[in-house]
A protein has these predicted regions:
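Non-catalytic, topology-defining segments of multipass membrane proteins
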Residues: 1-206, 211, 251-295
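Active-site-proximal inter-transmembrane loops
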Residues: 153-161, 215-241, 246-248
Length: 295
């Protein structure tokens, strides 16, 4: 079943949401990110095709299945349904990006939609491009992934014991994966399929937070600064069609025109053909350039 949906409004809280402490440098997060970037640079000097191929495959698994199809379109917006085992699988894939656990990720993104480019938005470029891209991650509490705090904004996931466990141990799948990569291909494999793949995926997601609220076209007259950015869409499995998404947040399809390449939508359609995806919400857009006021 595919359900057509029109432009949507998300209610905005009258009070700014204070989610995380913004004071002080988060040294743990900062050191980890610096080390990952050093590893990504080192990978360029230890290239081999096997490690590169594994990195590309894991990028699809982690960022494509885990973030775009999982954390974002499934867990956060519930734009389609899959069997519970597949929902769990997508969540585990999402942790491989080092973007946090599922409860944390969905909470942050739901708040972003509720307060998009307004006071309380966790990562708005109105506070600076650097802040929106990565700055908001580098400050505040030592433990960003506070399950109890995030449960307020992701109560549906917080009711599930598996999601609570995964949120508290979101680092574990990457530790296991790093060990496997070392056994399979040594240091080059760890640097490419680990460090380089993670860093590239982080920046792809961060560009959705920063670039797609600064550069690109606006098909819909949303109340925020969201844009459709083709080059961000290319590296993020269709997440760059961000203005479309903010106008229709529960649509499983983000690329609404034939020329807006949206790999995640194609994969969701494939799951439907295989009988694994149902209750799919799709934005119904009569005119490609119609302006509509939405979330």
């Amino acid at each position: 079943m595919v359900e057509d949906i029109g432009p949507q409004r998300i209610p905005v809280s009258k009070e700014p949401i204070v989610l995380l402490d913004r004071t002080g440098l988060n040294w743990i997060t900062t050191v980890i990110l610096v080390m990952l970037h050093i590893g990504a640079i080192a990978a360029l000097f230890m290239f081999n095709w096997k490690a590169f191929a594994v990195a590309v495959f894991l990028y699809w698994v982690a960022t494509g299945l885990g973030i775009s199809m999982g954390y974002h379109r499934l867990h956060t917006h519930r734009s389609y349904k899959v069997p519970l085992w597949m929902e769990y699988f997508f969540a585990v894939c999402g942790t491989l990006t080092l973007e946090g656990g599922p409860i944390f990720w969905t909470a942050i993104h739901r708040i972003h939609h509720q307060r998009s480019d307004q006071p309380g938005d966790p990562h708005s470029p109105r506070e600076g491009a650097w802040w929106a891209h990565v700055g908001w991650i580098l400050v505040g509490e030592t433990k960003h992934n506070n399950t109890r705090l995030m449960a307020k904004y992701s109560p549906d996931l917080a009711k599930d014991r598996f999601y609570v466990w995964l949120n508290n141990n979101h680092w574990l799948p990457n530790v296991v994966l790093a060990g496997v990569l070392w056994l399979v291909g040594g240091l080059p494999m760890v640097l490419w399929a680990g460090c380089f793949r993670i860093v590239f995926g982080l920046h792809a997601t961060w560009l959705v937070n920063s670039a797609t609220h600064m550069w690109g076209g606006r098909r819909f007259n949303t109340r925020d600064d969201s844009r459709n950015n083709w080059w961000v869409a290319l590296i993020s499995f269709g997440e760059g069609w961000h203005n479309n998404h903010h106008a229709h947040p529960t649509s499983a399809r983000h690329g609404l025109a034939w020329y807006e390449f949206d790999p995640s939508w194609l994969q969701i359609k494939l799951l439907k053909r295989l009988g694994l995806a149902k209750s799919i919400h799709v934005a119904s857009v009569k005119s490609a350039m119609a302006e509509r006021e939405a979330a």
